[in-house]
Swiss-Prot record:
Sequence positions that bind ATP: G122, P123, T124, G125, A126, G127, K128, T129
Subunit structure: Interacts with FAM83D and SIAH1.
Taxon lineage: Eukaryota, Metazoa, Chordata, Craniata, Vertebrata
Name under which the protein is recorded: Kinesin-like protein KIF22
Entry-linked SUPFAM superfamilies: P-loop containing nucleoside triphosphate hydrolases, RuvA domain 2-like
Subcellular location: Nucleus; Cytoplasm, Cytoskeleton
Ubl conjugation is among the record's keywords: yes
InterPro entries, A to Z: Hlx-hairpin-Hlx_DNA-bd_motif, Kinesin-like_fam, Kinesin_motor_CS, Kinesin_motor_dom, Kinesin_motor_dom_sf, P-loop_NTPase, RuvA_2-like
Residue ranges of the region described as Disordered: 389-423
Mitochondrion is among the record's keywords: no
CDD domains reported in the protein's UniProt record: KISc_KID_like
Organism listed in the record: Bos taurus
Amino acid sequence: MDAGLPARRRREMAAAISGAGRCRLSKVGAGRRPPPARVRVAVRLRPFVDGTAGENDTPCVRGLDSCSLEIANWRNHQETLKYQFDAFYGERSSQQDIYAGSVQPILRHLLEGQNASVLAYGPTGAGKTHTMLGSPEQPGVIPRALMDLLQLTREEGAEGRPWALSVTMSYLEIYQEKVLDLLEPSSGDLVIREDCRGNILIPGLTQKPITSFADFERHFLPASRNRTVGATRLNQRSSRSHAVLLVKVDQRERLAPFRQREGKLYLIDLAGSEDNRRTGNKGLRLKESGAINTSLFVLGKVVDALNQGLPRVPYRDSKLTRLLQDSLGGSAHSILIANIAPERRFYLDTVSALNFAARSKEVINRPFTNESLQLPVLAPVKLSQKELLGPSEAKRARGPEEEETESPELPIAPASASQKLSPLQKLSSMDPAMLERLLSLDRLLGSQGSQGTPLLSTPKRERMVLMKTVEEKDLEIERLKMKQKELEAKVLAQEAADPKEKENYSTTMLRPLARRTVTVAKPLKKAVVMPLQLIQEQAASPNAKIHILKKKGRKRKLESLDASQPEKAEDGWELQISPELLAHGRQKILDLLNEGSARDLRSLQRIGQKKAQLIVGWRELHGPFSQVEDLERVEGISGKQMESFLKANILGLAAGQGCGPS
């Protein structure tokens, strides 16, 4: 089979395989993708706590069978509300029953490169921490799951098995919307990120490798003491934070094609919702309770959004829901253990927990296998300068000295047939599936070769293209040199014909641009466009007076310019207004201020509803205005506003009267 393939085809096929890097195969094979999985919900009813049950106290919740329960209807005491879940564990159920019935079956998914999560939900004092941690006599879900998972990894990763497995653990808490590393408490608040493939990760989170249950206990027990707990009126050891234990299982295939898998297990102990009227929380405890209730409220919003199919799911509204993005509506096999209490004083909390559990079981997750393929990458072949440029270009780059001292090249012996077939001989050890892929690739290359498709990736063809490019550049340089010589000849001819032109040309054109002196004309004055007539200044008669409107500082005033002093006058355009029209405009504005109504006053520029009312009120109290400048005496109109009013209205009126040059 190896000898039947052309040598060039085998080299290209080997390069295509060996040159491939790490490719994502998270959706490898439609048949291997698991079907959508619904969030499984189990309800655990804890027994009465010692000292809390009275003689006539009966539980408000009663189990019907292994999957259903009923609770009294608070609206109608003669009716009961029935709930059905995937599993129901009564007060006589043990830790082993809960673990074996609901948690243990999902551990196998981790060895398939899939994610799984277990959440303990319920009100404060319902037994969530006991379900997850337990006691030395009755271990909970976390120690049992780690013990079985480590045993599975030892069996699957033993010598002679196709996969090598490794397990790491991380432990964190979400306290008042801060992500804290319990393995390294000094790390501070950590951030939650999302990579390009949609995976949730926490940069800087400590990961401890574990190979046995003793390793797990050595890291987990001290970290558990770092979790924030506090005493309330309802619970002496109330968890004040959400605790998350993250266990990663990495698998590497020992033989080709060297696949890699990663499975993550989330074990989450949620803090309980609290009624501050009953817990008596104050100060710090009240702040902690607010953060807990807020995150649990957002968790309920996420569940409702997933069930209703809303376009936006509010994962980012809380650190807890952001971290649980894989568990609810994501790619994990999820188990929700709702813990409830039998006491009647917890009735409303129990109903709320059951309603949340009933909504959660409608959430659909879509698990997939986190698998990637790692192929060996060959080192790039280093080519010499002579092989890249060719013989002629290499001689030009070396120079005459190196060319004389160069030793003659020895003839290279042709490669043997076994050396030519060496890239393909490595394929004989591969599995049949990989060999089938290689054969299909060979057939594809053969079909392209039969159609005359050029193979431009060979070193000889690349060298020829490079040499052709260099030759084209050389021709372009020669053309530019010839053009430069022609231009220089023209310049010399012009210099010989006209010495004066030569001097001007040499000082302006042949001088470098960076050294040219640029003469800047005197800047023109900035003219403000006003509704006045623009005239060009004419030669005035002696001793004539011209009134010109000029700007000096922040105020405008009329100045007299003696036209008999021509050296002080500047050529240009000036703004002029007739004194008669100015007086007429002032009188018209004064009449309008004294006789006009508020509506008439609003027709003036810079006068609005408020200022018009102020003017009318001042006129009624103090009588008519004697001059336009009295407008400044009105309360609420400053001197600057009065000047702006005069400029806007008097000049506009003058323009309307058709003022001309004086």
